């Protein structure tokens, strides 16, 4: 029993320590709020917004947003941190976009998303600003549209963005008479920017057409989503022409021929068109609705096209091309590494050398009959920081003392290169926890071993 209590106490203590360690190592993603944003909003052609009716914004016209954001050096931005910008209620995103925010060094700085439901654009950062924390800056460019549910038009619309007041005159929705033969429009999906919705109305005046043949061909970089196709002859109502695409979508069908069309494919096997012939005479308006999928990325503001053509025994060939604007956005970021102060080390080295040399010249004595050369040389050398050389001969001596002091001074300059230092972001938590766990197991093993003995 006593052993079990000891074991329970040990496990409890270790659990508390491990829990405290885990809590201290978890890093929480933060919302970045300390920044400066210099922003501007213009019309799609770059001209400034104005409450002058002659410079009005069209009902469906997109507005261009430019945001230039800077962060103080002391603000730490970690991987997973986010920054959110919200549109005023008078504006809205037309579709959900996800786009990259690229750093000037070629690395990904963050992912940005626009949400048409909340009117927010959110950037989720990578660790680039941990590696390069100084002079942090970012730009975000995107389009938005007037939120027709929250404004009264025609007239002046006022709103605030980034603490700046804007005022713009907005036109009413254009009322354009539908072509008596064919009308076609397209628009980008609100949730998926890779999808384009197309709507077609043919023969809205309900005239009698013999053997009506329709042929629809989508533009480049698109394929038809077959399951989305709705193609129908609308119910004929005498004296009640189909005045709009909305009315066409709501009028009862006389015949649904969606499953009877013949599809065309391109060389890649993608469905890019369809055709159908209504035999005999028909005075029904025709409504067609379907979705295309983009097969490649589109540049900002580029329009994709879609063309439908009709022919019949008693009508001239006619075609109509519809366009859908592709919304897009982009971002850029820049920063630099935090450099350490440059260190200069000066090292002065002094070397003193003193040498003393004594030289004795040899003398040769000569008699009249005998030449006798006698030379005695004695050399003594001692090294004690001074060097002395002495030469002695049997003749006259000349002592020449010489002392030389040599001083050498050298300067060494050392420049330390800037080091890239990554702050702890909690990524080491797994490794450290594993190590702590092994230590705990080892301690527990020793404890049980000694207890049993």
Swiss-Prot record:
Q: Where in the cell is the protein located?
A: Secreted, Cell wall
Q: Name one GO cellular component term.
A: extracellular region
Ordered alphabetically, the record's keywords are: Cell wall, Peptidoglycan-anchor, Secreted, Signal
Q: Propeptide per record: which residue ranges?
A: 426-453
* Chain spans, region Disordered: 331-403
The membrane-topology field of this record reads: Peptidoglycan-anchor
Query: Which GO molecular function annotations are given, in alphabetical order?
Result: collagen binding
SUPFAM superfamilies, A to Z: Bacterial adhesins (SSF49401)
Output the PROSITE patterns linked to this UniProt entry: GRAM_POS_ANCHORING (PS50847)
User: From the record, what ranges are coiled-coil?
Assistant: none
Its GO biological process annotations read:
cell adhesion
Under the heading Gene3D superfamilies, the entry gives: 2.60.40.1280, 2.60.40.740
The leader peptide range reads 1-29
Q: Where is this motif: LPXTG sorting signal?
A: 422-426
Name of the protein? Wall-associated protein
The coding gene here is: wapA
């Amino acid at each position: 029993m006593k052993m079990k209590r000891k074991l329970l106490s040990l496990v409890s203590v270790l659990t508390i320590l491990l829990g405290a360690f885990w809590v201290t190592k978890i890093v929480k993603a933060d919302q970045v709020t300390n920044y400066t944003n210099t922003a501007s909003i213009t019309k799609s052609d770059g001209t400034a917004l104005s409450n002058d009716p002659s410079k009005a914004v069209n009902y469906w016209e997109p507005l261009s947003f430019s945001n230039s954001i800077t962060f103080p050096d002391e603000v730490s931005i970690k991987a997973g941190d986010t920054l959110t910008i919200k549109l005023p209620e008078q504006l809205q995103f037309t579709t959900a976009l996800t786009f990259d925010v690229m750093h000037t060094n070629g690395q990904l700085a963050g992912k940005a998303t626009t949400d048409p439901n909340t009117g927010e654009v959110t950037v989720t950062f990578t660790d680039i600003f941990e590696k390069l924390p100084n002079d942090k800056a970012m730009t975000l460019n995107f389009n938005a549209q007037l939120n027709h549910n929250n404004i009264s038009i025609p007239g002046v619309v006022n709103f605030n963005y980034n603490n700046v007041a804007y005022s713009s005159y907005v036109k009413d929705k254009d009322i354009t008479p539908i072509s008596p033969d064919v009308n076609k429009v397209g628009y980008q999906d609100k949730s998926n920017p890779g999808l384009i919705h197309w709507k077609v109305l043919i023969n809205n005046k309900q005239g009698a057409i013999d053997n009506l043949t329709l042929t629809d061909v989508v533009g480049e970089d698109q394929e038809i989503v077959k399951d989305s196709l709705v193609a129908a002859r609308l119910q004929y109502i005498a004296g009640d022409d189909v005045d709009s695409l909305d009315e066409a979508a709501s009028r009862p069908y006389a015949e649904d021929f969606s499953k009877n069309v013949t599809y065309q494919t391109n060389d890649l096997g993608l469905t890019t068109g369809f055709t159908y012939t209504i035999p005999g005479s028909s005075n029904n308006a025709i409504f067609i609705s379907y979705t295309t999928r983009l097969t490649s990325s589109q540049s900002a503001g580029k329009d994709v096209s879609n063309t439908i053509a009709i022919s019949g025994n008693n009508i001239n060939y006619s075609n109509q091309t519809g366009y859908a604007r592709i919304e897009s956005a982009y971002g850029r970021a820049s920063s630099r590494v935090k450099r350490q102060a440059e260190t200069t080390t000066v090292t002065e080295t002094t070397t003193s050398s003193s040498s003393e040399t004594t030289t004795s010249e040899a003398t040769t004595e000569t008699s009249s009959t005998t030449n006798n050369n006698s030379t005695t040389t004695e050399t003594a050398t001692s090294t004690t920081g001074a060097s002395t050389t002495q030469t002695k001969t049997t003749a006259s001596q000349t002592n020449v003392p010489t002392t030389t002091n040599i001083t050498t001074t050298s300067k060494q300059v050392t420049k330390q290169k800037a080091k890239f230092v990554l702050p702890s972001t909690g990524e080491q938590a797994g490794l450290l926890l594993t190590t702590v766990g092994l230590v705990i197991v080892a301690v527990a093993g020793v404890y049980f071993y000694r207890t049993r003995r």
